[in-house]
Amino acid sequence: MEKEKKDDEKPDLENSVDFSEQFNQLELLKTHGHLIPTGTQSLWVGNSDEDEEQEEKNEEWYQLQEKKMEKDPSKLLLWAAEKNRLATVQRLLSEKAAEVNTRDEDEYTPLHRAAYSGHIDVVRELVAKGADVHAVTVDGWTPLHSACKWNNTKVASFLLQHDADINAQTKGLLTPLHLAAGNRDSRDTLELLLMNRYIKPELKNNSQETASDIARRTSIYHYLFEIAEGCTNSSPPS
């Protein structure tokens, strides 16, 4: 919420492809003329920005905050998920002190908070304990929307492997791709989404804009849409 307001099935890995973090698959497609095969999805693992995101707070400060919220386990779980307090999240869930899909006043779950903050270990723990990857906020945001808005590619990749809907639309008809397209630092997330054969880049928001329209206006990476065009949902010539 604070950050956002500034502006279960097992994963199907059989049909997935992994790739190095050091090269651009979309540009490889362009230079080699390859097509994305049916069922392909990226397992990009990315780099975590958790250390950079964390404020300069010492352990004593965090423990003091937790003590203040101890009588409200749901509030504590939401806070701990956002602040990357993995041990606290694990304790609350193991003690069943708080429900894994508890919500705040705007219907954000702990998974939403961990997703927009980029805390992959907390995300893994929450999903393992039954967190709903399809949960929506009052504005219709899923955890995948939250991850893609803030270019948390590692989290987005994990959520997609756990059945998150890549084409889910908010109440404003925004897809995760729309949100990534509006972020000037979103190259990694754009690559992840555009490499997924199930992506529907033609979907429009309530302003009748596609993600490509937004990227051309706001991002230096609009060319990624041009590279991906004709590759996704295609079959090699016979």
Curated annotation (Swiss-Prot):
Record-listed Phosphoserine modification sites: 48
Name a single GO biological process: positive regulation of DNA-templated transcription
Stretches for region Disordered: 38-57
- Its chief place of residence is nucleus
Q: Which Pfam families match?
A: Ank (PF00023), Ank_2 (PF12796)
Q: Where in the cell is it found?
A: Nucleus
Q: Which GO terms describe its cellular component?
A: nucleus
Instruction: Report the protein name in the record.
Output: Ankyrin repeat domain-containing protein 49
Which organism is this entry from? Mus musculus
